[in-house]
Design a protein with these regions (language model features):
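Extreme N-terminal leader/anchor segments
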Residues: 1-69
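Intrinsic-disorder-associated interaction segments
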Residues: 3, 10, 14, 44-45, ...
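Generic structural signal of hydrophobic/aromatic residues within well-ordered alpha-helices
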Residues: 6, 10-13, 17, 21, ...
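Polar helix-capping/helix-linker motif
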Residues: 28, 44-47, 114, 125, ...
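Long, low-complexity, highly charged intrinsically disordered regions
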Residues: 64-81
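Aromatic-lined, polymer-binding surfaces characteristic
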Residues: 80-257
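Carbohydrate-active enzyme catalytic cores, enriched for enzymes
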Residues: 222-297, 301
Length: 304
């Protein structure tokens, strides 16, 4: 018993020390310089908001950017952690009225960039960072277009630097959901900046997620129908992004979508909860609407 407790203590001490060293490393100048090695280029591909609609829930009521306190938006220290995360992931950009002033949107983004030039454990978490990059690029009409060269350079540098960090850290994430979201962010950045390194890394990561998450019959190892729907949504999203940007679609992606699509076609017709781990009765109306939006009609869905 004494030996077991001693080993447990040593293990805990080792892991704590390792984590502390890791935190110091991420905040070091050495690491900052490492992720700052970037070849600056401009956005050449802008993903359609309709393709990303399965990823983001839009507020029906549009926000006018002029109504926000652009000068003090990053100085509010009274926000709860949840609201702070929502503010820093920039998903609220999807609810901004497109008639709003791009210059105000860009001034808010540039203030964030200046405040978060280096790694910050609160604002550079995998899920928050991934959502921020997706939102910045997807909303380029407000966040990027009609800006001067100086702004574009800072924006491009920040996006690429954050993606470099994401690539370094994503394998350490314990959440498959966060890994998949990060994978989407890396792929979108690779497509938008015509960066083959990012695109190839993102697609290779996607392949690893598929290998580790599915059994030989292409069903989630969790046996969860909800998880099946989650994966299918993201895989269809990646395929549509590749298709829209005129890039080749990997065979493994078409294959997993085909088999998940067949399962989805069966389970989506069942209204009652199924007796699998962690399953609940699902409302599939929104995803079906999305499939129709990207022209995958019901009769062809078994063949996807």
């Amino acid at each position: 018993m004494y030996l077991k407790n001693s080993l447990s203590f040593i293990n805990e001490f080792f892991n704590t020390s390792k984590n502390q060293i890791r935190k110091l490393y991420l905040k070091s100048n050495f690491y900052n310089n490492k992720i700052s090695k970037i070849e600056i280029s401009n956005i050449t591909y802008r993903p359609s908001l309709s393709i990303l609609s399965c990823l983001v829930k839009y507020d029906k009521k549009k926000i006018k950017i002029e109504e926000l306190d652009k000068d003090n938006i990053w100085e509010n220290e009274l926000l709860s952690n949840n609201n702070l995360n929502k503010l820093n992931n920039f998903y609220w950009l999807f609810s901004i009225d497109l008639k709003s002033s791009p210059s105000i949107t860009q001034s808010i983004i540039i203030k964030w960039i200046e405040k978060n030039q280096s790694y910050n454990s609160l604002t550079w978490q995998t899920d928050i960072l991934s959502k921020r990059i997706i939102s910045w690029i997807a909303n380029s009409k407000l966040s990027y277009d009609e800006s001067d060269t100086k702004y574009k350079n800072k924006f491009n540098f920040s996006v690429n630097k954050q993606i470099n960090h994401l690539i370094n850290e994503i394998s350490k994430s314990r959440s498959v959901n966060d890994k998949l979201l990060g994978c989407i962010a890396i792929i979108i950045t690779g497509l938008s900046y015509a960066n083959e390194k990012f695109l190839n890394y993102g697609l290779e990561l996607l392949k690893k997620i598929i290998i580790n998450s599915f059994d030989d019959e292409y069903f989630p190892k969790t046996r969860s129908i909800r998880q099946l729907n989650f994966y299918l949504k993201y895989f269809v999203l990646v395929r549509e992004l590749l298709k829209e940007s005129f890039n080749d679609i990997p065979e493994y992606l078409d294959e997993i979508i085909f088999y998940l699509g067949k399962s989805y076609s069966v389970f989506s017709k069942i209204e009652q909860s199924l007796l699998f781990n962690g399953n609940h009765q699902n409302d599939l109306k929104e995803f079906n609407k999305y499939l129709s939006l990207i022209h995958i009609s019901e009769p062809t869905r078994p063949y996807w």
